[in-house]
Amino acid sequence: INAAGPWTKELLNKNNINSKFDMSLVRGSHLIVNLKIQCPLVLQSEKDGRIIFMLPLKNLCLIGTTEHKHLIKDPIVCTQIERDYLLNIINSYVDLHLTSKDIVDEYAGVRPLVFNSNTKDISKISRDSAIELNQSLINIFGGKWTSGLSLGHKVSNMIETNSG
């Protein structure tokens, strides 16, 4: 089973295995700031329409998320551009004057998005998954953390069906 997430396509390419699916990688970054809030807050960026959230996290606040195209060879880190993007949106709605000095931690992750080659806008790419059987190799493309259990059941059923 090839369930390598963002590295699924690279693993296939390195082993000269063809697939009808392609993937785009999208990096999302989050900030944890020294701010205590009482309840979650959802904001919409006036610049690009993206949804940004603020979630209470003990005595801190989790802010997310960004969405940038990511190349497999690039480091998976929150960039200064992403920090500024999130802080500027929060500060445009709420008079907090948050700066980089308020950031106590940050993290980034890469989402593999499965698509056909005609899709240009990453916000329009489905967050669904695709499963492909290539002889005895099951390849999983895309997916979300929230649908992982369902995806696991589909793969399990595929194994049972194809194990003879």
Regions found by a protein language model. Name each.
Residues 8-63, 68-164:
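C-terminal catalytic lobe of FAD-dependent flavoproteins
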